[in-house]
Amino acid sequence: MFFNKKISIYVFLSLTLFFGFIFDENSSGGAKIDHKYLFPFIENFSYSLETGLKNFLSNSASLIHSPIFYLLISFLLKISNSLIFVSVFYLLLCLSLPLLFYQILKEKFKTDDIIIFYLSIIIFLSPYFRSSAIWLLGDNLSLIFFSASIIYFLKFEQDKEKRKLKE
């Protein structure tokens, strides 16, 4: 019962993100403008790596972002040739962030309590998470990589403790 309730809530909140995508939700207020400003960098990287890096490095405003996001998205754009496909793919990828956060909390606190689940899905209510997922901005990808690294760090720490106990 508890498991089905969690899945239902997660699916419902995921659907709200898809509805936000369909209706061009801009809950943070600046994501649509950021997308229009940053999308040419993605296009430049999809033409060629050299052109992309040249334009990226020549613009001081772009240097606050990592070029990895632009490289990954431009690669997807190049192979699919569809911005809608890339946007939906990125939206689906962003749906992993609450799951990763849930895994972090579960590993750290060694429990599968409902409170941990509710804490992890609060991410869906963040206007910045929603806007970044909907408008193809790199913030969520950074958080996904960071969360994955935390999970591996926690597992490493657990393994280290187990090895100490065996000695």
Map each language-model feature to its residues.
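Short helix- or helix-capping micro-motifs
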Residues: 116-127, 131, 151
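Membrane-interface starts of transmembrane alpha-helices
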Residues: 8, 81-89, 111-119
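Membrane-interface transmembrane helices that cradle and orient dolichyl/undecaprenyl
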Residues: 107-113, 149-166
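Transmembrane-helix motifs of polytopic, lipid-linked glycan transferases
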Residues: 85-109, 148, 152
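Loop-to-helix entry region of an early transmembrane alpha helix in multi-pass inner-membrane enzymes
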Residues: 57, 63, 67-74, 79-96, ...
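Short acidic/glycine- and proline-prone juxtamembrane loop motifs at membrane-interface regions
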Residues: 131-141
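Transmembrane signal-anchor helices characteristic of membrane glycosylation enzymes that use polyprenol
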Residues: 4-39, 125
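Extracytosolic helix-loop segments that constitute the early lumenal/periplasmic catalytic or substrate-binding loops
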Residues: 18-20, 36-61, 68-71
